[in-house]
């Protein structure tokens, strides 16, 4: 058989095999077109489960007369015009295939009128070449699509239709999903002349729970926990049922939407399931209605014929974001705020990237710790609030720390009598707390230094380790902690959990905050030196180390962490070496006076100089 171009009707019928699975598929495509047209009211009439009639009328913007024929053509759409549009789709439809595919397997008529037109027009396609006929009609502003005798010309497809009741149940489920996505649209559904569903539009700021209860039932509404979670371009809102009271009937309620598009996505379901796993049995499923808003450039919806699936460009970030959002509202059910004596509760801190969710936002502010924390007092001049348990989460943290170091370095020396040798002492003292001048980098991780005419070699990785230990060792106040954007959740044994609970006070002084449940521990904050580390490796090793200890001293733990940190630089530059030495000289002056083994090695150049002179 020679290669040939398929007739338009046959090509459309092949496409319909992917798009039009059953009457519910037709309803989905046509209602989504109505929503894209800006409709605020949609009336859906079904007869015999959709096998005989599917009629959908809306009050959207309508279609112009000269565009009606194009509307029934393949790959004709008003929703995208370029590749840039395809990479950031905001409409529900975009391929321009639905009407052509549906008209090829049914008797379809399209009647529409725009606000600018005085009369409406009706179009329908027929024949082998799908020629479109347009004629005048009576119709208000908006569009009506009527699909008669679905699959009349494809008997093989028609015989696979289920009973009238089953097919209508599928249509009813599609309308339920769409009604949950668009609270601002009135949707009426009738079957065989009887109104079955009436979903009235909810005004902006109105009670969405009323429609939620009408669709999902009062049992779900009674157990629903509201979620409001945001980070950057990601927003998660909706409801999740309390897993402790989830029944098999409730578990059937699993509705998820991405940018308003109903979705069945494995990644999203896995994140929700993982957040609920400690509270659900092995054979139980979570119940939820969740809405994910994401930058359209960060999600690809053109990966499934029926658009049931999407692909996220940063799938791990999306997974962990959803997981943490759901987990936060579930943990709120178990947590109660600790009493803070008789002190008034400080006002909530403004957080640019996150806003408080239902419960508490662990991306920005972890729960209060049990160990006694030092009391902070507000700065008298700045007018700022008292320091939070996470002082480094405030924008001015680095600047404040630098100011403290500067004040320490500029502390005036005791007054001395004006004796002759005294003026040289400050210079000598300053010189004694310096490793010297960095000449170059040798073998990528050693610095060649010059001081008072002497040459020495310094191991930068060892100096970095001593600096990290100094930064991690608590002084008069605990080490400042920084909350993790995505908290780290790890499974632990009973022995490891017991060790963590015993070491909680010491870890809190080191800036490590965690929360544990039956079989897991969630690391919510770490000190600054650990932010750039691979915590997936470091934290399990730290837990293993703690499980072998009987005494938990912050200094010993800090030393262990410092020895097990990976260097931030595989190959050092001059600028990085100079910065490191400046920090070491400031925080660890004792290393300059008495360098430990493995840090500094003097280099004797006299034999080399003598050899050169002897030549």
Swiss-Prot record:
SUPFAM superfamilies: ATPase domain of HSP90 chaperone/DNA topoisomerase II/histidine kinase (SSF55874), DNA mismatch repair protein MutL (SSF118116), Ribosomal protein S5 domain 2-like (SSF54211)
Keyword DNA damage: yes
Gene3D superfamilies given in the database record: 3.30.230.10, Histidine kinase-like ATPase, C-terminal domain, MutL, C-terminal domain, dimerisation subdomain, MutL, C-terminal domain, regulatory subdomain
A biological process term (GO) from this entry: mismatch repair
Domain of life: Bacteria
The keyword DNA damage appears for this protein: yes
PROSITE patterns, A to Z: DNA_MISMATCH_REPAIR_1 (PS00058)
Start and end residues of each stretch annotated as Disordered: 363-397
Keywords: DNA damage, DNA repair
Matches recorded under CDD domains: HATPase_MutL-MLH-PMS-like, MutL_Trans_MutL
GO molecular function, one term: mismatched DNA binding
Recorded GO CC terms: mismatch repair complex
InterPro entries, A to Z: DNA_mismatch_repair_CS (IPR014762), DNA_mismatch_repair_MutL (IPR020667), DNA_mismatch_S5_2-like (IPR013507), HATPase_C_sf (IPR036890), MutL/Mlh/PMS (IPR002099), MutL/Mlh/Pms-like (IPR038973), MutL_C (IPR014790), MutL_C_dimsub (IPR042120)
Pfam families attached to this UniProt entry: DNA_mis_repair, HATPase_c_3, MutL_C
Compositional bias per record (Low complexity), positions renumbered to this chain: 364-391
Role, per record: This protein is involved in the repair of mismatches in DNA. It is required for dam-dependent methyl-directed DNA mismatch repair. May act as a 'molecular matchmaker', a protein that promotes the formation of a stable complex between two or more DNA-binding proteins in an ATP-dependent manner without itself being part of a final effector complex.
Protein family per UniProt: Belongs to the DNA mismatch repair MutL/HexB family.
Protein name, per record: DNA mismatch repair protein MutL
């Amino acid at each position: 058989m020679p290669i040939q171009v398929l007739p338009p009707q046959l090509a459309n019928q092949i496409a319909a095999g992917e798009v039009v699975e059953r009457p519910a598929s037709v309803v989905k495509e046509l209602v989504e077109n109505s929503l894209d047209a800006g409709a605020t009211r949609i009336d859906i009439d079904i007869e015999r489960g959709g096998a005989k009639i599917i009629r959908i009328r809306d009050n959207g913007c309508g279609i112009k007369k000269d565009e009606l024929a194009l509307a029934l053509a393949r790959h004709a759409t008003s929703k995208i015009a370029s590749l840039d549009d395809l990479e950031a789709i905001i409409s529900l439809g975009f391929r321009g295939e639905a009407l052509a595919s549906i008209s090829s397997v049914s008797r379809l008529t399209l009647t529409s009128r725009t606000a600018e037109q005085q009369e409406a027009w009706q179009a329908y396609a027929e024949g082998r070449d799908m020629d479109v006929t347009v004629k005048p009609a009576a119709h208000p502003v908006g569009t009506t699509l009527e699909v008669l005798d679905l699959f009349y010309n494809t008997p093989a497809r028609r015989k696979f239709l289920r009973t009238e009741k089953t097919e209508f149940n599928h249509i009813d489920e599609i309308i339920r999903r769409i009604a949950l996505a668009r609270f601002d649209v009135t949707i009426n559904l009738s079957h065989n002349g009887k109104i079955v569903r009436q979903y009235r539009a909810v005004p902006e700021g109105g009670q969405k729970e009323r429609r939620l209860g009408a669709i999902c039932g009062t049992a779900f509404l009674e157990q629903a926990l509201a979620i409001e979670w945001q980070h950057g371009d990601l927003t998660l809102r909706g409801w999740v049922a309390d897993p402790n009271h989830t029944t098999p009937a409730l578990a059937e309620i699993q509705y998820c939407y991405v940018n308003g598009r109903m979705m069945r996505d494995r990644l999203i379901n896995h994140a929700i399931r993982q957040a609920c796993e400690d509270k659900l049995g092995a054979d139980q499923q979570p119940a939820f209605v969740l809405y994910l808003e994401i930058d359209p450039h960060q999600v690809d919806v053109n990966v499934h014929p029926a658009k049931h699936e999407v692909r996220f460009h940063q799938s791990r970030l999306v997974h962990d974001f959803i997981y943490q959002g759901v987990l936060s509202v579930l943990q709120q059910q178990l947590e109660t705020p600790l009493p803070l004596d008789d002190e008034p509760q400080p006002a909530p801190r403004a957080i640019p990237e996150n806003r408080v969710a239902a419960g508490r936002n662990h991306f920005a502010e972890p729960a209060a710790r049990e160990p006694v924390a030092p009391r902070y007092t507000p700065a008298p001049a700045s007018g700022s609030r008292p320091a939070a348990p996470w002082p480094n989460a405030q924008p001015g943290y680095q600047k404040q720390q630098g100011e403290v170091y500067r004040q320490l370095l500029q502390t005036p020396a005791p007054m001395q009598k004006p004796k002759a040798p005294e003026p040289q002492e400050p210079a000598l003292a300053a010189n004694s707390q310096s490793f010297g001048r960095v000449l170059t980098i040798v073998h990528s991780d050693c610095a060649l230094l010059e001081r008072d005419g002497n040459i020495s070699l310094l191991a930068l990785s060892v100096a970095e380790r001593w600096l990290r230990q100094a930064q991690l060792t608590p002084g008069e106040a605990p080490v400042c902690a920084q909350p993790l954007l995505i908290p780290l959740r790890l499974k632990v044994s009973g022995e490891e959990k017991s060790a963590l609970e015993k070491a909680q006070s010491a870890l809190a002084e080191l800036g490590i905050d965690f929360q544990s449940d039956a079989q897991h521990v969630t690391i919510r904050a770490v000190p600054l030196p650990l932010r750039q580390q691979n915590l997936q490796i470091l934290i399990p090793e730290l837990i293993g180390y703690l499980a072998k200890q009987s005494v938990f001293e912050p200094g010993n733990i800090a030393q262990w962490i410092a020895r097990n940190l990976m260097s931030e630089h595989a190959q050092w530059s001059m600028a990085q070496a100079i910065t490191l030495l400046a920090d070491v000289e400031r925080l660890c002056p004792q290393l300059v006076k008495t360098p430990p083994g493995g840090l500094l090695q003097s280099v004797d150049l006299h034999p080399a100089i003598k050899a050169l002179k002897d030549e």
